[in-house]
Amino acid sequence: MDVRSLPSNGVATIQDSAPTAATILGSSAATLGRHLSRRLVQAGVTDIFTVPGDFNLSLLDQLIANPELNNIGCCNELNAGYAADGYARSRGVGACVVTFTVGGLSVLNAIAGAYSENLPVICIVGGPNSNDFGTNRILHHTIGLPDFSQELRCFQTVTCYQAVVNHLEDAHEQIDKAIATALRESKPVYISISCNLAAIPHPTFASYPVPFDLTPRLSNKDCLEAAVEATLEFLNKAVKPVMVGGPKLRVAKARDAFVELADASGYPVAVMPSAKGFVPENHPHFIGTYWGAVSTLFCSEIVESADAYIFAGPIFNDYSSVGYSLLLKKEKAIIVHPDSVVVANGPTFGCVRMSEFFRELAKRVKPNKTAYENYHRIFVPEGKPLKCKPREPLRINAMFQHIQKMLSNETAVIAETGDSWFNCQKLKLPKGCGYEFQMQYGSIGWSVGATLGYAQATPEKRVLSFIGDGSFQVTAQDVSTMIRNGQKTIIFLINNGGYTIEVEIHDGPYNVIKNWNYTGLVDAIHNGEGKCWTTKVRYEEELVEAINTATLEKKDSLCFIEVIVHKDDTSKELLEWGSRVSAANGRPPNPQ
């Protein structure tokens, strides 16, 4: 079974290969740790993000003994988890290795974010000696109780499967089940391995390859037919239907099928903000990002005036709904989940796979270009490009005009929580240009680790990472790991003196941060080892020069460009969004 054929920016797919005779491994290769390393590689992981600790050192020895598995040592566990998240976004699966409790509880926040984004991250923890379980002994790296299950209980809410390996006899089964569950459910899993077991051989690790247990999910044919019939009846009555792609297109592996329906139907196609990059933006009927009051120009008018809208894998939370202010009506909506379809707030059809539903619908839908023709009528091209005067302080809008010119199928964009969300949403992505951000969880600082992981998974692309100064202060250390591993990312550090997104939701003195010498910090981290170039820019002409240097002379280096802008220079979309989210947060308690 070959499980290493993974779609770019998607979830791992498993492909059956011709049966091969089982290979019997020698005892040195038949250890628990070597078995785990082989299974990770077979699942698609060729890099692991690690922080050593005394409980995982023997395990790390076994993992890195596999020449197909590359160890990426991180500065802290949180960033290791974020890196595994970013890696999974590109490769379809990622893995991190930390030590018991002090490492596990540190990585927990990153695993929660991966869970919210439906990413199969395999979190591996080096646990206590198997002989210490059930002895009432108190160990270091714990909270001082003889019960060692606190870490496990914390992970139970943010992983879809937990394996605690204290015995060699069932280790093979537990590890395989954990990895298979992560791939099947597209959620993180937790594997704890006792520190004294990793280097011990066992007969169950000696035969390989052994297929993963990955039963494919299929639609119930009757349910699929009923869902398609009900949907066609609803759509054929509509005058101006539209399509909107949501973030669960990824976990449903339905992006191609969604585009097939767009081609067949002629409907205008929009995406929710957290699905940007999932639909080709060069599609002839693409109209932009639907985000309520902060949508792409003319997009919300078309979506909200439609008499039928197909939402594919949406997540409607307070952020994506702009403080619950979307002007949508459930009775006009067809909501397509990964495994079910809801038609016009009425019947729900279960056991229906999203990809199969869209493909079947594409074969039978009646083309209708009315809504797209309406969009074409009201669309007004963008006006004259903004240009700063010489030595005039750089403005964010002018900056992103130059960023747009950098994009190609050989680049990818990582947008940090904050105003980068809104500025990067306005970028027009060429075909093949990657795009990632973390909207559901919105953990500031995520992008540093995610950039590390995504760039490691996709060395053929140059990653452009946009990070605010406040977010960067949370996780800055792992720029070190990027340099150490020869990555060629371009980081744009937006220095506006504080937590701008929080300012627009609710201002206060706590949103002002201590200014750092950011380029000086990165120079200190660089310390003459590896390839790294830094610069500060205050004016448009300096930005143009910096981009030219980064893309030509320093194209093989990590480039760190600190962009200094006024603290109040924010996108108009953030101003509108912030006021609505603030209003939603500030609602008084309901009467009792």
From Swiss-Prot:
Keywords: Decarboxylase, Lyase, Magnesium, Metal-binding, Pyruvate, Stress response, Thiamine pyrophosphate
Catalyzed reactions: a 2-oxocarboxylate + H(+) = an aldehyde + CO2
Free-text remark on how the cofactor is bound: Binds 1 metal ion per subunit.
Enzyme's top EC category: lyase
Cofactor: a metal cation; thiamine diphosphate
EC number(s) on file: 4.1.1.1
Positions bound to substrate: 54, 141, 502
Binding site for Mg(2+): 469, 496, 498
Region annotation Thiamine pyrophosphate binding: where it falls in the sequence: 419-501
Induction text: By wounding and paraquat. Not induced by anoxia.
Signal peptide per UniProt: none
Tissue-wise expression: Expressed at low levels in roots and shoots.
Gene Ontology MF terms: magnesium ion binding; pyruvate decarboxylase activity; thiamine pyrophosphate binding
Record note on quaternary structure: Homotetramer.
The family this protein is said to belong to: Belongs to the TPP enzyme family.
Name this protein carries in UniProt: Pyruvate decarboxylase 3
The species this protein was found in: Arabidopsis thaliana
